[in-house]
């Protein structure tokens, strides 16, 4: 149904236009907001993010969004850094205790620098993913479909993983923790399969 209340959370640390256009192309109207009433009244929410986890968490705190995101009961999709923020912590600044970035803690995932061997970082470009069977986020998406990635840090594979990818090491390409979903890739930049994934999320 295209009359859903769809909200992109205005974190201040992402370029929301490409995500907005991808949703609008599917026939949905989109609101960009950080207003608690608007966010909590949404049927579906998107949490995009670019940049660093430390800057993103700082922005979320300054905008009083940390607790608000944790109160969301409807499906929420974190994209790229937005997915990483759903995890417990990020080591993007280093592995020492005073360098660890605390994230939202909505799943147990920990974000660490990808160990890629001779492969270049960032992991940038098209790669295939391996979804688990039966998750509705990947309904009617062909096996071995390519999605577009741009990242140097990844979340380890865990119980929350609903799709994995391999780039020197396996990492979580998509996760689900209750009503919270996340994708490390950019569905809004992943052609028809990316559009299908966004449609699947909106139809949950």
Curated annotation (Swiss-Prot):
Major localization listed first in the record, in broad terms: cytoplasm
InterPro entries: Class_I_gatase-like, GATASE, Imidazole-glycPsynth_HisH
List of catalytic residues: 80, 186, 188
Superkingdom of origin organism: Bacteria
Recorded catalytic activity of this chain's protein: 5-[(5-phospho-1-deoxy-D-ribulos-1-ylimino)methylamino]-1-(5-phospho-beta-D-ribosyl)imidazole-4-carboxamide + L-glutamine = D-erythro-1-(imidazol-4-yl)glycerol 3-phosphate + 5-amino-1-(5-phospho-beta-D-ribosyl)imidazole-4-carboxamide + L-glutamate + H(+); L-glutamine + H2O = L-glutamate + NH4(+)
Keyword Cytoplasm: yes
Protein name in the entry: Imidazole glycerol phosphate synthase subunit HisH
Name of the gene: hisH
């Amino acid at each position: 149904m295209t009359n859903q209340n769809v909200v992109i959370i205005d974190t201040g640390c992402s370029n929301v236009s490409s995500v907005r256009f991808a949703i609008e192309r599917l026939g949905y109207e989109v609101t960009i907001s950080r207003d608690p009433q608007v966010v909590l009244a949404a049927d579906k929410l998107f949490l995009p993010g670019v940049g660093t986890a430390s800057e993103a968490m700082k922005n979320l705190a300054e905008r009083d969004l940390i607790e608000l995101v944790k109160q969301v009961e409807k499906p929420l999709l974190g994209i790229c850094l937005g997915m990483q923020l759903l995890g417990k912590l990020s080591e993007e600044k280093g592995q020492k205790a005073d360098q660890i970035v605390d994230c939202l803690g909505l799943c147990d995932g920990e974000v660490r620098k990808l160990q890629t061997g001779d492969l270049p970082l960032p992991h940038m470009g098209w790669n295939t993913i391996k979804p688990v069977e039966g998750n509705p986020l990947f309904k009617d998406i062909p096996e071995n479909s390519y999605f577009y990635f741009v990242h140097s840090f990844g979340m380890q594979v865990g119980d929350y993983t609903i799709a994995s990818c391999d780039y020197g090491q396996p990492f979580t390409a998509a996760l689900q923790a209750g009503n919270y979903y996340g994708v490390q890739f950019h569905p809004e930049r992943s052609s028809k399969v990316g559009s299908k994934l966004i449609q699947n999320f909106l139809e949950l």
